Amino acid sequence: MSRIGKLPVSITKGVKVELKDDKVIVSGPKGTLEQKLRPEVTVSVDGNNVVVTRKDDTRPSKEMHGLYRVLINNMVTGVSTGFTKKLELVGVGYKAEIKKDMLVLSLGFSHQIYFKTPAEIKVEVPAPTNISISGSDKELVGQVAAKIRSFRPPEPYQGKGVKYENEVIRRKEGKAAGK
């Protein structure tokens, strides 16, 4: 990971990076994110770049070096442009809608699923079979999308379920009829 770690993170316009104690705080038009740092890495702001350096050349230090560089890069991208994941509902009668602050899913069960999203995440339903999840925290956007997908993951025989927008479902052949 050190090849990634040695690249500086460029700070886009409108984004502010602060270093406090053992935390990196990135704020921008889409919000504020903070990341606690491990002792293996040090972070410095050099003009319009954030530079991540490691203390020594041990394997854990090299791993943390690349990891924290990518985490800070994702924070800068998140507060400036944000992240979006899109889900599709495939199946007869599968639909989603938003009621108040809850996402209501009808996924072929005998009951509807009510999902309360975190305050930092924006969930939109442009069509009854499409869900768009957006926010500034890449990890949280991915977690919410994975949680919604876990209610009815796509099955390999007919492809029904909740899937990511460009996800390819490996299909299986059904039972072959005997004589």
UniProtKB/Swiss-Prot annotation:
Pfam families according to UniProt = Ribosomal_L6
> Which GO cellular component does the record give, naming just one?
cytosolic large ribosomal subunit
Q: Which UniProt keywords apply?
A: Ribonucleoprotein, Ribosomal protein, RNA-binding, rRNA-binding
Ligase recorded as keyword: no
Q: Give the domain of life.
A: Bacteria
On assembly, the entry states:
Part of the 50S ribosomal subunit.
Task: Return the similarity comment.
Answer: Belongs to the universal ribosomal protein uL6 family.
Q: Supply the name of the protein.
A: Large ribosomal subunit protein uL6
Organism annotation: Chloroherpeton thalassium (strain ATCC 35110 / GB-78)
State the encoding gene: rplF
